[in-house]
Amino acid sequence: MLFRSGVLGIDMGADGNGGKFLLQPAGGSRNPASEETVAAKDHTIHMNGQEVFKFAIQIMGKTAKRALAKANMKPEELDMLFPHQANYRIITSAAKRLKMPMDKVWVNVDKYANTSAASIPIALCEAQKAGALKKGDNIILDGFGAGLTWAAIVLKWSK
């Protein structure tokens, strides 16, 4: 399905059962920050890295493939993959599951570390400034996050 915005296909979801693996226990409306939550450091992100890693390496490939299917495309039709920049092992795993060579995968985690929800927009901005994106390129943005949540979107680049 082609939308006017350049969106070719999208997949997203959430599984609250994994919420305990990546969360901020306090600081929101459900559990407002207090002296106690600050002292307990509950206003910071808590993560079970091993569980999040296992989730990330399986979901990034699945969600990307589902978004590609909705776009009636195959991975080899992609010009570039922009994965969430959590760590290099997760990035290479996502590329491997899509059978994408690393020269088609934008990586900047080595420069900035994990910039959380900003990682894909930063990567897109970098790629555009570097001239790595051309009008008509088929790209995919592929990520995961707290909750546990995931999403992938296939786009036709229009700039």
Question: Predicted regions span which residues?
Answer:
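Short, surface-exposed connector motifs at secondary-structure boundaries
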Residues: 72-77
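Short helix-to-loop capping/linker segments positioned immediately adjacent to catalytic or ligand/cofactor-binding
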Residues: 52, 67-71
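Condensing-enzyme catalytic core mediating Claisen C-C bond formation in acyl metabolism
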Residues: 1-54, 58, 62, 144, ...
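Claisen-condensing/thiolase-fold acyl-transfer catalytic domains that form or cleave C-C bonds
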Residues: 57, 61-62, 68, 79-159
